[in-house]
Amino acid sequence: MIGRARTNLRAEIEDQYEILSFLVSDISSHYQEQVDDVEEKVAEFKKVNANEDYEIVSSELRNFYAASEICDSRCVQSRQILFCAIFAYYETMLNRIIVSYNIRPCNQRDAKSMVEGICKFFLDKYHSSLEIENLVFINEYCRLLRNHFMHGFLSDESKRKALCNYSERFGGTTYYSDIYYEIVDNSFLVKVLKTVLEILTTLDDALCEQRNE
């Protein structure tokens, strides 16, 4: 919205987005540097000790590979933690939108319910529908993935099947059976974070425009 003053709500949405963007980039670089460092040391060790006893070389290489596995594991875990933080940001800002625009009644049980409540409020009050893109990606796929990470397992079989289907449809994760999911790389986190920002700003812009008319 051109010329719009930056409200406290918009400041929260944008500032927390910037913080999360920095964390996603910084943590990725940190662990990738560690992985690259180990790989360089392995290559150098193999070159220097090419003619040494095989058992001795293999023993030392196992130490390098163990260090590499630790880095990889931490990288995977950090993506999972950041993903859950991004979804928590999404839910928190939806709550802030509901409070800021006095949206009542509104089921605040989860992100999906909150967005549905905001859209219903908008339709009932302003007789106009909100057009929001990528809701299935965030409110279905990412919501189920967050629940899987938080609880370690989705107890409902239909939800497990749905998550598998969304993973194949949208990508960004690999899974083994339906009990273990892993975020492939940081590009998925960037996509989720940008999509969340788009949804939040779309809601905020539409509500602010109607309130100011």
Predicted regions located by residue number:
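Short helix-capping and hinge/turn segments at secondary-structure transitions, especially at repeat
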Residues: E91-C106, H127, H151-L154, T201, ...
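Short, mixed-charge amphipathic alpha-helical segments
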Residues: K120-A162
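Residue-identity detector for glycine
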Residues: G3, A88, G117, G152, ...
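Short acidic alpha-helical/loop segments enriched in Asp/Glu that coordinate divalent cations
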Residues: N95-I118, S158-L163
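Short coil/turn linker and secondary-structure boundary residues
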Residues: C106-R109, S113, L130-N134, V184
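Extended intrinsically disordered or low-complexity regions, especially N/C-terminal cytosolic tails and loops
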Residues: M1-C84, E133-E140, L144, R160-E213
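Short, hydrophobic, well-ordered secondary-structure elements
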Residues: V76-I98, R143, M150
